[in-house]
Amino acid sequence: STNRYSAIMTQAEKVIAVSDSVVQYITEHYKNCPPEDIVRIYRGISPQEFPHGYQPSAQWINQTFKDFPQLENKFLVCLPGRITRLKGHETLIELMQQLQSQYPNLHAVVVGGADPKKAAYLKEMQDNIHSKGLRDKITFVGHRSDIREWLAFSDVVLSLSNQAETFGRTTLEALSVGTPVIGWNRGGVAEILSSVYPQGLIEVDDQSALLNAVKQHIDQPRKVKPVTMFSLKEMCDQTIDLYKHVLSLD
């Protein structure tokens, strides 16, 4: 946002941006911030916390099938994120409507809680799902503390936000454990996918491209190579180096 609070944050000697898209946003909206004062340091995750090839425990899987028996023996498409109009849930519903007859084994999982203020929107979505005959095709599992397990358990993860993500950490976490991600070509998500899994990139709001990408992943499951970028260590090292540089200027 371009409020006064955000403007104050651009008055420091150096401004850290978590992606190139944030660098561009600051440059365009905060003319008083010299471009040379903006330093791009990508956010990072721990490869130890999200190891390539990670699989949930048998106990977790058994409990999940007990809680959500409709997920068993399904091709799972996961949309992570809180319940808000910004996260692209309507796009997921349309996608499932288009795919359900051709792929009866396909099931969507929405991982994310709904703030009490969003209760009306959640009901609106559920009514939409019901009217389209998709109640047994889309499962809302609510807010979860075991996001790593859900990302690894899913066959494909979607990133369909209506606005550009500043970074897209959940996209990176999914790719890190080896789950393919399909997402719009904008913001931090596009930067991650371009570097790690370019076949998951689709043009913004191109519904037919999204449909085809999901079909391709169902018909021929893809492998994600181990992620060697965007580590927590890199982020910390670059941040400390920047602090040392700023201190040396005094």
Where does each model-flagged region fall?
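Short, structured helix-loop element that forms part of the nucleotide-activated donor/catalytic region
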Residues: 22, 109-135
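A short helix/loop element that forms part of the nucleotide-sugar donor recognition site in Leloir-type
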Residues: 51-70, 125
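Active-site donor-binding acidic/aromatic loop of nucleotide-activated sugar
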Residues: 117-122, 135-144, 150, 201
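Short hydrophobic beta-strand element within catalytic cores of glycosyltransferases
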Residues: 180-183
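Conserved acidic donor-binding segment of nucleotide-sugar-dependent glycosyltransferases
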Residues: 195-208, 214-219
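A charged, aromatic-enriched C-terminal amphipathic alpha-helix characteristic of glycosyltransferases
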Residues: 219-248
